[in-house]
Amino acid sequence: MQTKIKKLIAQFHTSLQKNKYDLDKLMILDKEFLGKKGILFELTQELKNLPHAQKSVAGKLINFLKQEIIFTLQKEKETLKRNQLNAKILQEEIDPTLPAFNFCQGSTHPLNQIIEKIEDLFLSLGYEIKEGNEIETLFYNFEMLNMGKGHPAREMQDSFYIDSQKLLRTHTSNIQVKEMKARQGKPLKIISSGKVYRKDDDDATHSHQFMQLEGLVIDKNINFSVLKETLLLITKELFGNSQEIHLRPSYFPFTEPSIEVDLVITKKDGTKEYLEILGAGLVHPQVLKNANYDPEKYQGFAFGIGIERIAMIKYQIENIRYFYANDIRFLKQFARNADNENY
């Protein structure tokens, strides 16, 4: 039995040398020795005919032969596959000095560019950026902002209600009142931005979803002059230092007094056109009380900007729907720096 096993080892290595460069022949050799009815299986069957004293030695030799064949075949298969892969790579003649493909990259959306520009301005002035929920309770969306039950803004035709107590926020002021409560009567300077939702009929200038950015300052000795100076900073940042603005009285339930800000545009014929860009005002005393501020000690101002409206005026866009159409031909016009080359 031992002599037979030694001959089989020699036979295996001889066959291996002849077939080591052909993967299919290596698979045949594998099956010949290790298959269900292969040579090793037949050897194992012969063990039962051996005397008991020889079975142990013969069994060890068969197991050694099996492990030797498995290890050697696996090693040769891996070597052959690796050599085949290397040969294939060499045949492709890759030139590593060639420039890489110029993959297309996107750029910052024009609405986000406006938001980032405003945020950079207010960060330089010491403001904090805050974020909040798009699904809000009636309490934080309306009641905290001096809009009690029965107020027109709470009517079903103006808002997207989820249930009797929740809705899609109609402004980002929900972020402000939550931050006011969290500060527990201490001064704050924040801006917040995000999507808001109102039941408008979609057309060239209106959308049921749009972007809004709001600012809020609460401190001692805050007055209308501070608000006006802040509004001038915004318009200069967005439209240039020479841009003239016009303030006119308005009404918002959460500010008193309230104003709307118009850009003053001088036409070629010398006449002036007024384009509304934002609303603002001094924080209503009741809103301060709702958030545990003493209106006798603290005052504040707030402003809200419709980002799409700013972008439409700044870039002379005629249809608000262009911002959401995902048309590369439109968006590439606003790509900054070298990004424009990647479209």
Curated annotation (Swiss-Prot):
Q: Which domain of life does the protein's organism represent?
A: Bacteria
User: Where is the protein localized?
Assistant: Cytoplasm
Pfam families per the UniProt record, alphabetical: Phe_tRNA-synt_N, tRNA-synt_2d
| Cofactor(s) recorded in Swiss-Prot or TrEMBL | Mg(2+)
Q: Which SUPFAM superfamilies match?
A: Class II aaRS and biotin synthetases, tRNA-binding arm
Q: Tell me the residue numbers annotated for binding Mg(2+).
A: 256
Q: Name one GO biological process term.
A: phenylalanyl-tRNA aminoacylation
Protein name in UniProt: Phenylalanine--tRNA ligase alpha subunit
Organism from which the protein derives: Aster yellows witches'-broom phytoplasma (strain AYWB)
Tell me the organism's taxonomic lineage.
Answer: Bacteria, Bacillati, Mycoplasmatota, Mollicutes, Acholeplasmatales
